[in-house]
Amino acid sequence: MKKVVAGFFTLVLYCAQMEAQEQVTDSMAIQQLDEVVVSDSRFALKRENSGKTIIKITAAEIVQNQGRSIAELINSKSGIEINGSRSVAGQNLSYFVRGGNNRQVLVLIDGIQVNDPSQIANDFDLRLLDLNTIENIEIIKGAASTLYGNAAATAVISITTKNASKEKVALSLSSILGTNASQDDDNKTISNFNNGLNINGTLEKFSYVIGFANQYTDGLSAASGVNTEEDTFSRINTNIKLGYRFSEAFNLKVFGSFDKIKNDIDGFPAPLFQFADTNDKSVSEQLRFAIAPSFKYQNGSISMNASITNIDRETISDFPSVFESKGYNVDIFNKYVFGEQLYSIIGFNYQKNETLFAEEVTYTNNDPYANMVYVSEFGLNLNAGARLNKHSEYGSQLTYNFNPSYTFGLGSGYGKFLGSYSTSFIAPSLFQLFDGTFGNPDLEAEENRTLESGFEWNLGKKLRFSGLYFNRNEMNTVLFTTIDPANFISQYTNAEGEAKIQGVEFEIASELFLGLNFTANYTFTELNEGNRVRLPKHRANANLNYKISDRTNTAITYQYVGSREDTDFSTFQNVALDAYSLIDFYFGHQFKNNKLKLFINITNIFNEDYQEIIGYSTRGRNYNLGLNVSL
């Protein structure tokens, strides 16, 4: 494999050298002054008028991270730790945002909420998605329950899939081959295969996107240690995205997708019930259909996002399980702009989740909501709103947000001070309430309160710097509690006291000189009261990207994860995990006809030995070679 990498790298370097005289006319500008953000208001507003420090992952950044998973890419952003993203491909993922957990993170795909009612945390599994099908991602941190409802307590991850080309027919192909080895494995054989096909186009008023992707990965065992078997992971993605513009005022979009993952897992076999290298398996299938009509009128629009999701999951182990779940979501909302300063949205969100345990269980949400954004001529901006959560099990709960900011001129850019106070409501999942082994129907709903204060200086390409302090309180946090370790009896319970989390986040982005861009972020998270595992107090990421020519660029990324604690389930005691640092490398070249691109990335260059989860493997130095073809 090393010889293949060396030959590939030499070829691409030669092509890049032939074009080195080209002027870099389109440098990778990190942030533009006219950058538009949507997720925090549902309106396309300039970044300077937003009261949040929103994370945007562009199409260009996604291209530079080919060979990685969507979880790995999101994991490089401030305030976010996606635990399990550096382990075996099929490892379950934990979303830690500002000290929270999976149940407090909401995922949107093309503006439509997605979740799995059968999951413990009612969350969406990012392993189901292929990064090559994604156009861009926006992430807002902090409670956003007013606009997005139950579960949007620490973050909303808004994912937009690839859009149709203006051409009648456009075809793109991608293929990636790579290794998948631990730090102790010197046999760097090709064991990671990732392929994608996308056909799209526009025929007058009709647009279409049809995509297919598959991944097959082996070479690494979930359980760490010697003489362990390889645990394979495979994924199939198919998606279709259709649009029709009936008139200038009315358009309709229809979405459909089928995603399936199969992976070998290691578990806790009888009679000792301690983690070991086993032959367990897991299969998960998701079928999703959505429709999104929109009608525009003078100064406003009426839209609907409606979806049906069917998910089947099966685990084959000493603790076998089969889950069948369905999710229904309808969000109808009216947007209206008063002049050019006041943006309003009024909506109603219906959600129904159902899962089959010993019998079918279900709950519903019926939530009216309203939100307004005021953008003044003198720099004051205000985002405020409220939602009445009407839950079939927990009655009515009012959540609200208040988010002022002040923007002023700063040289050729702007400065901004911001603050926010927001609340959120999180009902226990169907699993936590009704599972026959661990469920507890007497659980109370969780309530969150989030306070933020920060600033942002933005000078366009040259510099963007932001800092933010956050303070979160969790009441009635749902915990998995071991009641009787000797007999392996556990149940979900509510925490007796409040969990209090605070921290700071810093981000910087700068074009050091033409073609050379630098980004970095640092997060400090402190848990004052409560209990969290696998949550580092200190995290940092950095990226140095150099665009050698219009068609060639290279990047080096760095990630630091501080020490943290994890639970050793053989002793039910918490133990400390050491801090670690990872460095990755990327090099890509687009050929002159713009039809072919070759790239290479090397992850964990220095083969750092570390643990994400006690007893589980992590990836060592690995290589990925890939190509993109556009026709």
Predicted regions, residues:
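Outer-membrane beta-barrel translocator/receptor signature
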Residues: T133-E135, G149-S158, A164-A223, T232-T238
